[in-house]
């Protein structure tokens, strides 16, 4: 009798554990809803490349999730904070991804919405930790590589860069570009200008034309206007997105920002919180993913490949290989660059 009772209890216990396991499995989330606060608009490579990364991630379906998102027009300050609060209070969103300097806004609400994972991006943010994650994007490695190319191809020894703002994650790639150029050509003269905006094509054209007038025969444009290069019939480099199609006769290659590993990291953190009960543990220090981790890359030369001399291409290819293998580490220099 006692044996029969014990077996019955064991059976009931096994059934209970089985039911719990089935319930836990059934409760795993199948949908992930993300609200994205944009800073410059989809026409800007900074914002446009993020949405492209989300589209690729949606196709890959990490953890079997159906990922959906909504995004705002460009918002800053109180307007951005108001939008984030509306998203949070709606109860419809699991992640609020604020795609620039928004830690001030997050700080005012992160404790109030502990189940929401907040993301801020780039320089100017504060590492709050907890349920705020700080994504950083550095593309100084491919910028160095195109500098190696430009340093060999320039005929005037004068190279120009038109940047957005003199921010930490802008300065790094400008300095890397010129360091790469000087690694193969110590006579390089650098010209630097900032449009003081995340996106202003007219100002970018003005600055680019001024640099060309001073003798720059190759331009690295972080500001996405290539018309002056077309008019001067010189080659240029684009930034953050593959912009060759915008100017096929001038954009030799583009430095690429790939947000895919960052998006997947955030999805994994949210998934662990939802399924394992792991506490959010947002980083308080800068974390970035370089070329070897898939966070940065370079676009092809396309039909302009024959413009690149074989010797210059060989040095360029070796530089990329050394960066990818870790044999060469590109110096991280965030000092504000100036013209010679």
Predicted regions and their residues:
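N-terminal secretory signal peptides that target proteins for export/translocation
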Residues: 1-2
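N-terminal export leaders
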Residues: 6-7
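Repetitive helical segments and hydrophobic/amphipathic motifs
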Residues: 11-13
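C-terminal segment of classical bacterial N-terminal signal peptides
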Residues: 15-24
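A residue-level marker of the well-folded mature domains of exported/periplasmic proteins
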Residues: 26-340
């Amino acid at each position: 009798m006692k044996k029969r009772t014990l077996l019955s209890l064991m059976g009931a216990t096994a059934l209970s554990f089985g039911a719990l396991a089935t319930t836990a499995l059934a409760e795993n989330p199948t949908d992930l809803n993300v609200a994205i606060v944009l800073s410059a608009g989809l026409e800007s490579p900074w914002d446009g490349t993020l949405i492209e990364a989300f589209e690729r991630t949606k196709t890959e379906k990490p953890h079997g999730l159906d990922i959906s998102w909504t995004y705002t027009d460009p918002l800053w300050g109180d307007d951005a904070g108001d939008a984030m609060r509306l998203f949070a209070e709606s109860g419809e969103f699991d992640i609020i991804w604020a795609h620039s300097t928004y830690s001030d806004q997050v700080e005012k609400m992160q404790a109030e919405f502990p189940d929401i994972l907040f993301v801020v991006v780039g320089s100017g943010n504060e590492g709050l930790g907890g349920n705020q994650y700080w994504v950083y994007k550095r593309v100084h490695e491919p910028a160095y590589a195109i500098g190696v190319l430009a340093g060999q191809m320039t005929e005037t020894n004068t190279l120009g860069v038109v940047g957005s703002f003199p921010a930490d994650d802008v300065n790094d790639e400008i300095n890397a570009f010129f360091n790469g150029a000087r690694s193969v050509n110590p006579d390089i003269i650098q010209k630097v200008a900032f449009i003081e905006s995340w996106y202003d094509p007219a100002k970018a054209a003005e600055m680019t034309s001024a640099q060309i007038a001073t003798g720059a025969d190759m331009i690295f444009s972080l500001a996405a206007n290539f018309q002056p290069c077309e008019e001067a019939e010189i080659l240029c480099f684009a930034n953050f997105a593959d912009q060759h199609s915008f100017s096929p006769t001038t954009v030799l290659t583009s430095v690429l920002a790939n947000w895919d590993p960052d998006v997947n990291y955030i999805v994994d953190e949210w998934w662990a919180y939802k399924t394992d009960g792991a506490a959010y543990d947002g980083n308080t220090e800068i974390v970035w993913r370089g070329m070897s981790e898939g966070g940065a890359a370079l676009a092809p030369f396309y039909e302009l490949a024959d413009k690149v001399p074989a010797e210059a291409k060989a040095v360029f290819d070796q530089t990329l290989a050394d960066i990818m293998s870790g044999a060469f580490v590109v110096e991280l220099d965030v000092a504000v660059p100036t013209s010679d």
